[in-house]
Every structure is written in structure tokens, then in C-alpha cells.
């Protein structure tokens, strides 16, 4: 044990605990830490379904790009009357929705372009200029919130310390573990820091059928400086440390072996079916925009990311599936048992877990006992 009441999982399944403030101690010179700098949109909108005069809540969950001018068309989940104080899974259905219906959302007006393949999910289009849509969201929207947080959240409550472009529908919450002090300490110790931007989606829709589709496709952007830093670190044999599942999703979608752009699930499947990993020094990532449309889970072959700092997640959620790409189920189950014993928090403002990918751990050990696998649970 590293401290009397704090938990790393080694090859023998031994779990160690440490405060989140010590996370930099488990990194090493030559590592590259990459975080998602997306700021969170006020994506929850109370309003009225004009044809029925029924009260509704609209939760924006997707748009096609990160372009600030591309702010008219969204996919959204629509609830009946109520707000976050009622558990999402207990929220009533909206009134019957049809293409052409007008939704009055405070200063904003939106038209349903299409009801998608679920009665609660629609494609809607806001009226007005991009500037007026942004202004209406800022004035009337609130952060998407769930019932376990009983106090209404302000927008700044869901912005991480590195929040920049407002494109996320829920916060990329792993970045709450960062602060400018820890980033400064990283750089003082020869640990590089870079960012990507990915429009983090929602963690729950309240409907089991829709939740099984999560995560929805997520647009992302990888800056040239970040791509260059990745190339340099991999060439020098360093590790890529992803801050959160959204960073893993973006980087693994963009990762290539031959210099061609990552494009489709089919190409990923063909690569995995061919057997074995190419030498990791050959892995590259292209700068630019993309849309992460893949699912990452226990069968995934991670091409680029060596370790992840993540929130602690419920085993039935899509975020947890990403953790299964890094660690075997038995060790994760042991970690979850420790999590419950220590009463760690599992929501977006909860505690953190640091996991090094098992294959990477065998050749890039970072601790005195030469563990081939380690995991760090960090109380807030």
C-alpha cells in the first residue's frame, strides 16, 4: 500500500491507492499526456411542443462537425415535462412528435426535420443566424444534468480547467483531474502535454434501447502540434497517456500504420483480422478533423494509446467498455470491488483510475517493483 487509506493493480492483482494529486508521480520523462479541451455546451433546453402545447425538455446530443457556423442542425433526445431532478430512466415520453413540428425553446425556435428510429430522438433545425443560435443557447440552455446531483449546475461547473471550444454535450470529465499546477509539474519533469478536441456525447438517454447505441458518433479535431508531438514521442519510445475515454476514441480512430487516413470500421476490422500489431513505432496519427464512429472494447487492438486516466465507471456503461481494452476483466472486477469498498464516486465529478495497457506495461515499466500491469485509483 502506498498510503494508509488510499489504492495500483500489479500482475498479482495487488491494488494500491493514492490521492489524485500524486498522479504525476506515476508518469515518467518522455511521456506525452493528451487531454480533450472541449468545453461543454448548455445542451439542455426547456420549452414547449407547439402543436400540443405540452412542456418538454430537449437535450442536444449530436451535430455533424465542430464548425462554429454549423450550429443549426442537431440530433436531440426529447423528454416530457420535468427536469434533471427526476431520474432520466423515469422521465415521461414526449408528446407525439412529427416532422415539421415547431419547438419553442425560450428565445430559440426549432423545427423537427425528422423523427429518427426512436420516438424520443429527432433531428431538429434551429431558426436564425449562427450568432442568434449561440446567443439563445447561452441565455436559455443549461448543462445536461442527472438526478444524483441535486443542485442545479452552472455552465462553469462543467467546464474543465482546460476548456476551450464549446462543442461537448457533456463534459470530458477525466480532465477534471487536471489543473495548471499538475500540467506545470509535468513539463518540469520532462512530460509533454497536448490537447485534442472531441465533442463528447451523452452518457445516458434514459432509454435502454438508445443507451445500447452509445457512444454516438463524435466529431473531433487533432491539431498539427499534437500530431507532431505524438510522432516525436513514439519515435523516442515514450508513452501516450490519454486523459479520458474521449481521447482514446479520437486517437485510436485517427491512428494509422501506413500513413493513410483512418476511415472506416471496415478498415479497422480488416486490420484486426489480419492478426498481430504492427511495430508501434510505425503508428502515426493525422492532424485534422474526423468523426469517431467506432466502438472500443475488450476485442479492440489499441494502436496508439498506452495508458488512460479515466473516471471510475459503472460496468454496464459504454465508457467502461473502453477500460476493458486496457485491462483484463478479472483485474477490472478486483478494481471495482476495491472501488465499492472505498466508496469511490462513479459519476463525472467522481474519482479517477489510471490504467496502463498490459502490452505496453511489459516493456515500459514505471515503478520500483517492475510490475507489468498497473492501475491507480485516485480519490479526489
Predicted stretch roles:
Residues 1-367, 374-380:
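A cross-family signal for N-terminal binding/gating loops and helix N-caps
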Amino acid at each position: 500500500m502506498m498510503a494508509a487509506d488510499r489504492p495500483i493493480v500489479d500482475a498479482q492483482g495487488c491494488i494500491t491507492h493514492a490521492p489524485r494529486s500524486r498522479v504525476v508521480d506515476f508518469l515518467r520523462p518522455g511521456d506525452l499526456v493528451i487531454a480533450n479541451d472541449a468545453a461543454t455546451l448548455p445542451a439542455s433546453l426547456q420549452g414547449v411542443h407547439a402543436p400540443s402545447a405540452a412542456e418538454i425538455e430537449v437535450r442536444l446530443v449530436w451535430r455533424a462537425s465542430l464548425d462554429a457556423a454549423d450550429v443549426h442542425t442537431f440530433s436531440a433526445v426529447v423528454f416530457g415535462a420535468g427536469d434533471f431532478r427526476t431520474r432520466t430512466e423515469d422521465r415521461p415520453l414526449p408528446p407525439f412528435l412529427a416532422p415539421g413540428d415547431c419547438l419553442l425553446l425560450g428565445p430559440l425556435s426549432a423545427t423537427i426535420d425528422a423523427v429518427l428510429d426512436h420516438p424520443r430522438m429527432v433531428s431538429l433545425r434551429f431558426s436564425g443566424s449562427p450568432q442568434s443560435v449561440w446567443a439563445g443557447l447561452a441565455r436559455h440552455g443549461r448543462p445536461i444534468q442527472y438526478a444524483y446531483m441535486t443542485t442545479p449546475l452552472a455552465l462553469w461547473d462543467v467546464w474543465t480547467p482546460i476548456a476551450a471550444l464549446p462543442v461537448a454535450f457533456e463534459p470530458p470529465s477525466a480532465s477534471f483531474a487536471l489543473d495548471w499546477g499538475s500540467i506545470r509539474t509535468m513539463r518540469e519533469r520532462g512530460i509533454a502535454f497536448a490537447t485534442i478536441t472531441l465533442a463528447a456525447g451523452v452518457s445516458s438517454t434514459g432509454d435502454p434501447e438508445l443507451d445500447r447505441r452509445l457512444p454516438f458518433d463524435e466529431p473531433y479535431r487533432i491539431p498539427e502540434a499534437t500530431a507532431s508531438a505524438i510522432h516525436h514521442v513514439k519515435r523516442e519510445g515514450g508513452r501516450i497517456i490519454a486523459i479520458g475515454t474521449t481521447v482514446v476514441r479520437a486517437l485510436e480512430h485517427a491512428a494509422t500504420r501506413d500513413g493513410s487516413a483512418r476511415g472506416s470500421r471496415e478498415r479497422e476490422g480488416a486490420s484486426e483480422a489480419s492478426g498481430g500489431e504492427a511495430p508501434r513505432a510505425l503508428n502515426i496519427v493525422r492532424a485534422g478533423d474526423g468523426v469517431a464512429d467506432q466502438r472500443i472494447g475488450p476485442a479492440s487492438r489499441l494502436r496508439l494509446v498506452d495508458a488512460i486516466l479515466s473516471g471510475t465507471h459503472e460496468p454496464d456503461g459504454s465508457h467502461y467498455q473502453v477500460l476493458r481494452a486496457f485491462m483484463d476483466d478479472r483485474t477490472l472486477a478486483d478494481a471495482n470491488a476495491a472501488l465499492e469498498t472505498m466508496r469511490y464516486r462513479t459519476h463525472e465529478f467522481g474519482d479517477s483510475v489510471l490504467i496502463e495497457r498490459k502490452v505496453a506495461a511489459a516493456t515500459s515499466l514505471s515503478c520500483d517493483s517492475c510490475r507489468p500491469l498497473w492501475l491507480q485509483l485516485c480519490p479526489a
